[in-house]
Amino acid sequence: MPTGSPVDATEGSNHSTRRGVLKKRVASFSNGIHIKSIRIGLASPERIRQWAERVLPDGTVVGQVTNPQTVNYKTLKPEKGGLFCEQIFGSIQDTDLTTTRDRRSRLGYIQLVSPVTHVWYLKALPSYIAILLDLPKKHVESISYCTETLSVPVAVHQTTGTLAPNTSTGRATTETNGDRGHASPISVELNPSTNQNSMELFDAPRLTKSSSNLKLTSDLGKAKQPLLLWESSSRSKWLRGNHGDFQANSNLIFQLNEKCLWFNTFYNSLKLEKSWNLEFPESARNSFVKKKPSKSPTGPSNTSSGDSLGKDGTMDHVSPHKANLWGSSPLKREGWVKSAQQTLTQGSQSYPYANGLSFNEGKSKEMGVGALRPQGSENSLFGTHDPFDHLSTHQVKSEQNLFKTPTFDNSKQSNTAENRDSFSRTSARSWIINNYYSVLQTCRWKSPSDWDLFLFYMTSSVNSLDKPIPCYQNRIYDSSGLPFDFPISGGAAIRNLLLNFDPVREDLSLIARQIENQSAKYNQEIRVLEQLYVNGLFMTRTQRKVLFALWRQRTKVLRRLKLVRYFRQTNMRPQWMVLSVLPVLPPDLRPIIQMNGNQVAVSDLNKLYQKVIFRNQRMLRFARGQYTINNSPEMRYAGRLLQEAVDALIANGKGGGATISDANNRPLKSLSDMLKGKKGRFRQNLLGKRVDYSGRSVIVVGPKLKLHECGLPKEMAIELFQPFLIRQLRTNKIAATIVGAKKLIRSGDQIIWEVLKQVLQNHPILLNRAPTLHRLGIQAFQPKLVDGRAILLHPLVCPAFNADFDGDQMAVHVPLSYEARSEAWKLIWARNNILSPATGEPILTPSQDMILGCYYLTTTDRIRFKSTWLASKSQQTGDSEASFAMLRPKHGPSGRKPTQDLCTKGSAFFAPDNTAKQSEASFALSFFSSQEEVLLAYHHHKLSLHSLIWLKWEQDFEANTTFESPLEIRVDKNGNSTHLYRNNLYRFNSKGEKLQQFIRTTPGRILLNQTISQTLFTKQV
């Protein structure tokens, strides 16, 4: 009979199954992932979402972090949707399907409202974004931080609609760029029976707080012109005070047969931030005639417009004049206008129509929230405004309660987002806009007015007679359907500029070719100027400045060309340097740890992520409010704050940016701070592991070592080579057992060092100094036993290790196998690593102590020499021999012929009672016949290391006697002459034949020369 019930057996089997699943998961983690290579590059927003998003069993897609909260500090449980959310990053406890190790690898992401530039590519030296765009770095940073805009004409014409024909379908689409940054197309149908198929159309201009002055159109005789109708005259006047002028001017219409629309509009007169007067020039007033307005009810219940056209709604001809007389202000989402605050105003608009142009659809809309715009049944292509045009289809369900029911009298239509479907329009992208961002900045005009005219021409709308250019058929659009020249500041503007350099575009090769042609032009101009120097011609200061400027421009162009080629080769897209999706690290890499008591330690990354989310939500509220992306100062300031928050997260305080600190004024550690440096993630946790047969000690200079040798302390050598030493002792029958060999080693017998020298003779060691930045950071050396506890190193190999002798430490590694030792001798032996693998230049260059020592040996003590010479001259009396300026020799060619025993026959050179100073004063100008005599006098302290002497020289030497005049020429009675120069002396006979030559030198230079000669003669390295 079984001891347990079936239920118990089932539960036991379930527990065993769970343990088996957990064991498999742990085993899979312990196996690890074998990575062959890693390439660092740019990640697209789609790739980041792919890394972070995952689908739950119920079909919910999670991964986006929307809540800035981390955990509940009372229960320490993660907040839903926050930076420690269990749905996004994994469970905090082991379950049947997952373990807590998932929280070390799962990413999240933050969807940014406005794109921001990556600080590594913006503020680095050099700035890759500035190089690629060929713009000054300060201007690119100003645009990124929303302190500068790309161009004013783009902002003025952002509400301009365009009508682009589609010859294949016989239809055309006009799109209006509203304040929200989303297109609201209106579909119209063209009559194929007429030749006049389209005309240039404009939406009603809108005033924002940043728009203070708009131009008046003075010439109304043109058929096509921008419609800029009013000026802002005063902020102190209300529309109520100007109501009479507005209504009087609105009754003026053209005298031709035109369609005249009348509309009644409610205005919010108490919440106006600007007021304006309509002003018309004298030339325009002649085009107006008075006409009695059509009768229409003016009661507050009338919210629709009346039409004074005929039944067919068409016209016989097109008027050459057009006008549009109304005002507007930003759409306000909150606060409806109360009945007591409403003021009824009547206005009219007049506009021409093409023959045969009929409307395909009519929209019935209601007034927006506090908007100063005409509402009602609008069958016009002018002034059409959809209060829901900022919403997309997938946003309707999530924003059902965004709008409230209006309080207008007798309002029968609802104004909620549920009616968004009735206002939906098909998206159209069949229009063309000139792209002026690809124009080189070197072609800019110096005059701002000329530049504005050029931008106005390039940003003008499409005419019906325009034909599309084949090269621009595949124009790249943003994901929102807008052309990439819409944003004028912030990261979105930089991203749209970088879209021109997308490798998938065909014209990127044209840009590269253009840069190559510009580089060739610079090379040609540089060669012309350099040829002047080669031919020995004189180069003026202006030409020299031009040459330096051309060198700088060529370097800049080549750097840009190299960057463009890199993007083409790697297939990376430059717009990925602008972040629209920000990845969030796994929570276990930025933990929250509970300390003793109620204290909690929070990683700095959590605070930086929170600041990014807070500012992103702030910008989202502004985007849903009354502020536009380009024109609102509030929106630009919010974008700048978001940019600074992301910069602080990636690299806090980089490039002189604002540093985010904690309550103790300590800068928070960013992602870059956690990666770089000695305490960074790589060097602290991933590198520098302990290995066997290795040691570490301080390095000191060993000038007597050869280049491939290093001094190894005896204490370290005993420990590192103990197995080899024991084997050698047993092989030589010195010790019978391993225990006996170890006992002999501990005794420190003299025979141990002899055997150890034999072991080290054919066994290299590897020296390494961290950080190992290139392959020369680890080299093989022949060890030599030295006393002490420091490693001796030849000073010439220090540049390869970037080492000096101020306390640096180096690690010693012992290659064990024969293969490792053979590779050490052949590949990384120090005497074979003479040239740098990066530049090909010699890397074994003298530096620091060696240069200082050589300088000290070869320098001259001119001040001391002059004082001793003057002292010796003052003691001379009745000298019949005239002096050779300052270099008059006391004994030498003028007194008697120099012989081999010149120094021995001089005045008291070896006198024991003379001091070194007196001997030096006497022999400061002495002549010596050989280098050995000079060194002998130096070792007897008769000369100092820097004493100037004359040395007889039998070999040739380099002298500047061709361009140098002798200081003095002396001729004796026999015709023999002596020519004295600054650093040499010649004696000729009467026939002009050279008898002797002397060079002026010092004992230190002679000592250095002999050392170098001996080294070269013995072929030592």
UniProtKB/Swiss-Prot annotation:
HAMAP family: RNApol_bact_RpoC1 (MF_01323). Residues 309-319 have a biased composition (Basic and acidic residues). Keywords: Chloroplast, DNA-directed RNA polymerase, Magnesium, Metal-binding, Nucleotidyltransferase, Plastid, Transcription, Transferase. Mg(2+) binds at D804, D806, D808. The keyword Secreted does not apply. It comes from the Eukaryota. It is found in: Plastid, Chloroplast. Its main location: plastid. GO terms for molecular function: DNA binding; DNA-directed RNA polymerase activity; magnesium ion binding. This is DNA-directed RNA polymerase subunit beta'. GO terms for biological process: DNA-templated transcription. It comes from Oltmannsiellopsis viridis (Marine flagellate).
